[in-house]
Amino acid sequence: RLFALGAVPRSTSTAFEWMMRQRGDLDCLHEPFGEAWYQGEDPLWPRYREGGTTTPGLSIESVWQDIRSRAAERPVFLKDFPHYINHIWTPEFLSHFTHAFLIRDPAKTITSMYDKWPDFDELEVGFPEQRALFDLLTALNGTPPPVIDSDDQLAAPTEMVEAFCKAVGIPFIESALTWEAGGDPSAHSWWAGGSLHA
């Protein structure tokens, strides 16, 4: 099975991903499509300039092949941003995933983005694409996918994670909500110096 959390930058999504890693029963992927969007052989991000970092052989298509191969071995959870792949949203592609969304107040998200990348482009913010994907999935499936509000998640983590697990059809593992200090989320990130997407 493939579980996809559609988020936006600076939405506490990496913390949610870290919690999902603690479960131990999922192959967790950190923004796999984002790596191709930013650093693939044909980067799609709007601030890319000739001579910037690229990775030969890395593309949205190669990432998708890798995800499917992993999912054939064990369940996969990925946290990613819908604006990285809005050009490949087809009913067939989207049908491979059990979808959920993590939202956060834009005032908090965008000010946090500005703090980390003062030169960010509006196409990197991702709110229009996140909403568009939610609406598309609702239309395709006849029912809206689960949505977690970051503020609710921070205020009542046990209740929110339990509800999330029930909604996507996985066991609730309460022990995943706590972990030893000192873990390094950047070890799972392709971004130089680790992820800035808290």
Per-region residue spans from a language model:
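Glycine-rich phosphate-binding loop used to anchor ATP phosphates in small-molecule kinases
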Residues: 65-88
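Hydrophobic/aromatic beta-strand patches that form the interior of the parallel beta-sheet core
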Residues: 3, 27-29, 98-101, 146-148
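PAPS-dependent sulfotransferase catalytic core
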Residues: 1-71, 177-198
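Residue-level preference for the first positions of well-ordered beta-strands
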Residues: 2-4, 74-77, 144-145
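PAPS-dependent sulfotransferase catalytic domain
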Residues: 108-177
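Conserved phosphate-donor/acceptor-positioning beta-strand/loop module used by diverse small-molecule
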Residues: 94-113
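Short, solvent-exposed loop/turn segments at secondary-structure junctions
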Residues: 9-11, 33-36, 82-85, 106-109, ...
